């Protein structure tokens, strides 16, 4: 656009200036005339009450859809099994519960947003206003203006007159948080005493984790390290990982004279001792053993336990000794547990004390 195309009243005013001086507009803060706001054009909802009613019903329908989607979210959470899968093209086989929760919660939130946008675009006041910049300091006049603007906004939103919109909006906003409340159920149930007990009980055979065969005393050589689990626990079992995380054992054979802890000696069989394989720091499986020092080392954070002295902690961040399992030999000559651990295995937790 050339200067000939600009209306004369919008051009900067001419001003006398010495030769070579920089050109400066007549008004540095506003070099062009303010064209002002265009005239307001009423919408169809502003002049036709029937159109306004249709918009009101549309907004209410969206808010109602949000409420129904929230109810569907809760129903899906309760009714759909966590292991159920469903084929969705092109996603393939996915969790039916996750798909249902995601879709219903997405619809619930989208419907609230869409309803609010449609309400603002069709029923709220759409007149443009200009507000001059003002100091940041909130003077009494400014605070009074804020209150007045709030009242004016409430009036222009027609929320007092459009009770159907108000009620359905409040209903949708009230129900949506229930989705998060329902999800709190996944924080429970409380573990109760599950962390205090394992699969070990009196008479349970010690099974070699590598060969899946019951252990005899002759299978454990002096200075060797053997990993064991309770009989009857199979890798394909649904709860295998949860159970082995508590019941895994380290079987070590020491010279009885080298055992320093009296209880450790009493709970052993001919120098064979059984300790929990789970580190008491953060639950890593212990797998390193020093034959000469009888020290077991956790590879995660280097917690070190003296297996000849009650598996006490001699180095590292672990908080307490490894629990020992009392063992013996049954009539058939196999190593067996004489009960469960006397204390919870693994890391400490609040209820452990």
Curated annotation (Swiss-Prot):
Transmembrane portions of the chain: 60-80, 99-119, 164-184
Residue numbers spanned by region Disordered: 1-51
Domain Rieske: 246-336
Highest taxon of source: Bacteria
Cofactor: [2Fe-2S] cluster
Cofactor binding comment, as recorded: Binds 1 [2Fe-2S] cluster per subunit.
Listed Pfam families: QcrA_N (PF19297), Rieske (PF00355)
Broad class of the protein's primary localization: membrane
InterPro entries in the record: QcrA_N, Rieske_2Fe-2S, Rieske_2Fe-2S_sf, Rieske_Fe-S_prot
Any one GO molecular-function label of the UniProt entry: 2 iron, 2 sulfur cluster binding
Places the protein is found: Cell membrane
Binding positions for [2Fe-2S] cluster per the UniProt entry: 279, 281, 298, 301
Biased composition (Basic and acidic residues): 40-51
Gene Ontology cellular component list: plasma membrane
Keyword Membrane: yes
Record keywords: 2Fe-2S, Cell membrane, Disulfide bond, Electron transport, Iron, Iron-sulfur, Membrane, Metal-binding, Oxidoreductase, Respiratory chain, Transmembrane, Transmembrane helix, Transport
Cysteine disulfide links: 284-300
Bilayer topology: Multi-pass membrane protein
Keyword field contains Plastid: no
Gene3D superfamilies cross-referenced by the UniProt entry: Rieske [2Fe-2S] iron-sulphur domain
Subunit architecture: The cytochrome bc1 complex is composed of a cytochrome b (QcrB), the Rieske iron-sulfur protein (QcrA) and a diheme cytochrome c (QcrC) subunit.
Protein family per UniProt: Belongs to the Rieske iron-sulfur protein family.
Cross-referenced PANTHER family: CYTOCHROME B-C1 COMPLEX SUBUNIT RIESKE, MITOCHONDRIAL (PTHR10134)
Function of the protein: Iron-sulfur subunit of the cytochrome bc1 complex, an essential component of the respiratory electron transport chain required for ATP synthesis. The bc1 complex catalyzes the oxidation of menaquinol and the reduction of cytochrome c in the respiratory chain. The bc1 complex operates through a Q-cycle mechanism that couples electron transfer to generation of the proton gradient that drives ATP synthesis.
Name the record gives this protein: Cytochrome bc1 complex Rieske iron-sulfur subunit
Gene from which this protein is expressed: qcrA
């Amino acid at each position: 656009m050339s200067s000939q195309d600009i209306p004369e009243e919008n051009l900067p005013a001419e001003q006398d200036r010495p030769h070579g001086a920089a050109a400066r507009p007549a008004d540095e803060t506003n070099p062009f005339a303010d064209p002002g706001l265009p005239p307001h054009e009423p919408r169809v909802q502003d002049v036709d009450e029937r159109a306004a009613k249709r918009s009101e019903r549309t907004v209410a329908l969206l808010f109602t859809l949000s409420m129904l989607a929230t109810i569907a979210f809760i129903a899906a959470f309760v009714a759909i099994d966590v292991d159920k899968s469903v084929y969705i093209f092109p996603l393939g086989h996915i969790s039916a519960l996750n798909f249902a929760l995601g879709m219903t919660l997405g619809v619930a939130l989208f419907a609230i947003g869409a309803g609010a946008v449609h309400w603002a675009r069709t029923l709220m006041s759409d007149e443009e206003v200009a507000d001059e910049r003002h100091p940041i300091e909130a003077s009494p006049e400014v605070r009074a203006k804020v209150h007045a603007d709030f009242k004016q906004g409430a009036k222009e939103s027609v929320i007092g007159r459009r009770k159907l919109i108000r009620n359905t909006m409040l209903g949708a906003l009230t129900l949506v948080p229930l989705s998060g409340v329902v999800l709190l159920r996944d924080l429970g149930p409380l573990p109760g005493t599950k962390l205090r007990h394992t699969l070990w009980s009196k008479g349970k055979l010690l099974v070699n984790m590598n060969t899946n065969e019951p252990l005899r005393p002759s299978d454990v050589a002096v200075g060797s390290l053997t990993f064991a689990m309770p009989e009857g626990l199979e890798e394909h079992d649904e709860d295998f990982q949860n159970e082995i995380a508590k019941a895994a054992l380290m079987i070590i054979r020491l010279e009885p004279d080298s055992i320093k802890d009296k209880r450790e000696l009493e709970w052993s069989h001919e120098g064979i001792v059984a300790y929990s394989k789970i580190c008491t720091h953060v639950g890593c499986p212990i797998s390193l053993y020093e034959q000469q020092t009888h020290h077991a080392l956790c590879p995660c954070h280097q917690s070190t336990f003296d297996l000849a002295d009650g598996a006490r902690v001699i180095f590292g961040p672990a908080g307490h000794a490894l629990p020992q399992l009392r063992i013996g030999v049954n009539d058939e000559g196999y190593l067996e547990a004489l009960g469960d651990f006397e204390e919870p295995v693994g890391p400490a937790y609040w209820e452990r004390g």
